[in-house]
């Protein structure tokens, strides 16, 4: 139990590092410069992202609604700052969103990867209920995960490693294990991330 708590503490620190990157001075400088010429709502998106980050990053599991809202804010900010932003489609099953809990940043991480590294023209975020579980998919038509990861622990690979570690540690406290898969074929375009989150068993506490 002591080892597991230490793992959870380290994962929280990794999430905080991700938040620092998300709200880095470089991003803030670019965002501020984007406000005047485009008359955009960049500042509003930045404030919302900061607010969600403060509320969420100290938690291991958050509501699906909050995770989706953070991801939408990130997409909106990215779109306001880039002219060549890919289309992002949200395919959300309303029955999957009531009272569901998901690992923190489990959608935002992969949306960010698709926007920043994949070079995709289309991204689909899908959430549905299947039996006694929530199924999440983030799919893009970009270069492909196996073709874009240049070195372990950097860029897209670092975010995926952190999420994989997070889910592995959280699974130690669950009777019904979460599943996390990256579907990518070397030399072929496109990546799909699939996360299956069974309904929580009684007595489980990963927060």
Protein language model regions, located:
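Two-component histidine kinase transmitter core
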Residues: 198-203
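Hydrophobic core positions in the C-terminal catalytic ATP-binding module
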Residues: 190-197
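Two-component histidine phosphotransfer core
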Residues: 1-180
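Short, charged, solvent-exposed linker or helix-capping segments at domain edges/interfaces
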Residues: 148, 204-207
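A short beta-strand-to-loop micro-motif at the C-terminal edge of the catalytic HATPase_c
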Residues: 179-190
């Amino acid at each position: 139990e002591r080892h597991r708590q230490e793992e959870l503490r380290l994962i929280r620190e990794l999430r905080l590092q991700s938040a620092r990157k998300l709200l880095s001075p470089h991003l803030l400088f670019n965002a501020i410069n984007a406000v005047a010429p485009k008359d955009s709502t960049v500042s509003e998106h930045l404030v919302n992202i900061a607010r969600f980050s403060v509320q969420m990053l100290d938690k291991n599991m958050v509501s699906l609604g909050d995770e989706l809202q953070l991801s939408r804010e990130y997409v909106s900010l990215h779109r306001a700052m880039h002219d060549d932003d890919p289309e992002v489609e949200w395919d959300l099953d309303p029955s999957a969103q009531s009272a569901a809990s998901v690992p923190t940043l489990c959608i935002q991480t992969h949306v960010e990867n698709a926007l920043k590294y994949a070079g995709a023209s289309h991204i689909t975020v899908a959430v549905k209920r299947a039996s006694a579980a929530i199924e999440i998919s983030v799919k893009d038509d970009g270069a492909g995960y196996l073709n874009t990861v240049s070195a372990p622990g950097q860029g897209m690979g670092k975010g995926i490693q952190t999420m994989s570690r997070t889910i592995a540690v959280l699974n130690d406290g669950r009777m019904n294990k979460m599943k996390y898969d990256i579907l990518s074929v070397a030399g072929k375009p496109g990546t799909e991330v699939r996360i299956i989150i069974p309904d929580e068993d009684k007595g489980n506490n990963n927060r």
